[in-house]
Amino acid sequence: MALGTRFPAIAVAVTLCLSVTHPASARPPRDWPGYGRDPQHSAVATVTGRRPLHVRWSTPVDLAPQYWGTSLLVHYGSPLATRRNTVVVTVKTGATDGFRIEGRRGDTGALVWTEPTDYALPPHNWVPSVGPVLARGRVLLIPGAGGTVLRRSRPDRATGSVRRYAFYGIASYDADPATFAATVKVTTPLTADRRGNVFFGFTTFGSAPLGLQSGIARLSRSGRGTWVSAVAAAGDPSIWKVPYGSAPALSLDGRRLYVAVHDPSGTGYLLVLDSATLGSLGRVRLLDAKDPTRFARLSDDGTASPTVGPDGDVYFGVLPATPNHFRGWMLHFDADLTVTKTPGGFGWDDTPSIVPAPAVTSYAGTSSYLLLTKYNDYAGAGGTGVNRMAILDPFASMIDPISGATVMQEVLTVAGPTPDADFPGNPLAVREWCINTAAVDPLTRSAFVNNEDGKLYRWDLVTGTLADQVVLTPGIGEAYTPTIIGPDGTIYAINDATLFAVDEGP
């Protein structure tokens, strides 16, 4: 929302799918362990997605949703899926706070286990996401009180052991849990590497113990922690913290950590850190793509997180400093953050997905991969209301007809199909695409995207059409949501405070 029947496997696509983030000799995992699936946030599935024609089961992700008029301004945590098809669901339990994590059978939705967490939200405008992560397919890591992380074993079993870890030392937390709970909070989804180390942004409030300042934390598999303040990581005393909801990303070899930071006014940097030490390796000031003398903005009301491409390039969505109908920009950098490349024409609350180029059969360019992004043109911010999804070529350019800026070339776009009666002065206006990270299936050459008309669509990247759809709800304006693909090909989407498991039906 603007701020204001299975397919046959395709052999070529299989090869493409495996090459995005996995060595050719490795059998790709079938799970969906975190936000954007992997630590690079590619959102590329390794199983064949089912056609979205039928709701198999559903479950609430909010037991007390609070509506602002007809809108729902809550970012719900991404569902996760284990290799054995347990779906992990983050549930908001109270009107203003309170959370629990559920494990449900992917085939039936039956509840397997419930794990409470003492995590409490920070002060906020839109409700930020709470994002657990599966580490090494064996344990579930959950945000807890006071900047701690809860580690639950055996995520596919009804029972599992739970231990708490603190990046500043569990003995310190145990000595004064109330003070830490009041002054230190995890404020981003958790990101785990292949060794089981976990990374996240945290925010401090008031006078936190141990001299803790808002920044970036790392916990090893054994629970040993380290941290760096946002100020020190950026080398800029004006910097405050990591934006709420912005999950750190890792390079393909896991050695580099990418994270955004901002000052109180919302301007800031994208940083690259050593993932072992959190030492600074580089930074880039985030600038407006139309006027690079002005700073772009980062919002606590979004979930934009860095995406790392198969070649190591880094993409990050920001808000604009110059008018472009509140679309923002998808900024593009090399792995060292020393070279600024052609931006995409949309960045607000969006984490781009990676699309292997041959999945788009009409594409005739030279890039090995493309980007999938939201591409709304908000009628409420001066746009036409022709809200689209887009496949972009990050290495080709065009002139943006909205802003006049040089942006990534559009390869394929599709407009929402449902007219938007809220904008009678814009006769072409359609309901917004409601997605912050979209599941991509190279095996069927498809992407799965939510819309504020209450439907989940399969975008066929061969025909360019919205080939399949299923009604989830009557539709609502809401904070953007993720889609994922489970190990059996079930599609999962959130709409109006409910998680839906979708397939082709009986």
Language model segments and positions:
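Bacterial N-terminal signal peptides that target proteins for export
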Residues: 1-10
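Short, conserved micro-motifs enriched in small and acidic residues
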Residues: 7, 73-74
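Intrinsically disordered, low-complexity regions enriched in polar/acidic and amide residues
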Residues: 7, 21, 408-409
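Bacterial N-terminal signal peptides
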Residues: 10-19
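C-terminal region of N-terminal signal peptides and the immediate post-cleavage residues
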Residues: 18-29, 41
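Extracytoplasmic/lumenal domain signature
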Residues: 27-30, 35, 44-73, 81-89, ...
